[in-house]
Amino acid sequence: MDLSEPIHDFLLVFLGSGLILGGLGVVLLPNPIYSAFSLGLVLVCTSLFYILSNSYFVAAAQLLIYVGAINVLIIFAVMFMNGSEYYKDFHLWTVGDGITSMVCISLFISLITTISDTSWYGIIWTTRSNQIIEQDFISNSQQIGIHLSTDFFLPFELISIILLVALIGAIAVARQ
């Protein structure tokens, strides 16, 4: 989007605060339904970040796949859970929980200082390939692959990191 720098910065702060509040809601809210709705807020804010960085295809895929399908599936799964079983295993924090929270808080503070010291306006998030590709001989799926590996490389890698974190979290939850 071609926005002026103050509007761009305001939208970054607004969406960033939406991401932080939604992420805190996912982790801290005791009701799983509210946590699932907070996850929806996080996914929508992430999609709006992609729109802000001119990655419209990735934003549409984020909205359709994650918000439209995965988050709705999570909400339905949480609605069918028995709520009384969820609160049986409540225990106080252990030493490992405290160490983990301190590591997470220090990582969060270092990320916030790095993000606040960086000028995000005018950064080119996509790269263009120097090769000329004849559009007549390439199918739509090949064009999507070419765009994902050239034009939208950084957003594609960021989504893969998000998926890896979600997979590790799902394995950790399934083990319990």
UniProtKB/Swiss-Prot annotation:
Coarse class of the protein's main subcellular location: plastid
Gene Ontology terms: cellular component: chloroplast thylakoid membrane
Entry membrane topology: Multi-pass membrane protein
Reaction catalyzed: a plastoquinone + NADH + (n+1) H(+)(in) = a plastoquinol + NAD(+) + n H(+)(out); a plastoquinone + NADPH + (n+1) H(+)(in) = a plastoquinol + NADP(+) + n H(+)(out)
InterPro entries cross-referenced by the UniProt entry: NAD(P)H-Q_Oxidoreduct_6 (IPR050290), NADH_UbQ/plastoQ_OxRdtase_su6 (IPR001457), Nuo/plastoQ_OxRdtase_6_NuoJ (IPR042106)
UniProt keywords, alphabetically: Chloroplast, Membrane, NAD, NADP, Plastid, Plastoquinone, Quinone, Thylakoid, Translocase, Transmembrane, Transmembrane helix, Transport
Known EC number: 7.1.1.-
Identification of the protein by name: NAD(P)H-quinone oxidoreductase subunit 6, chloroplastic
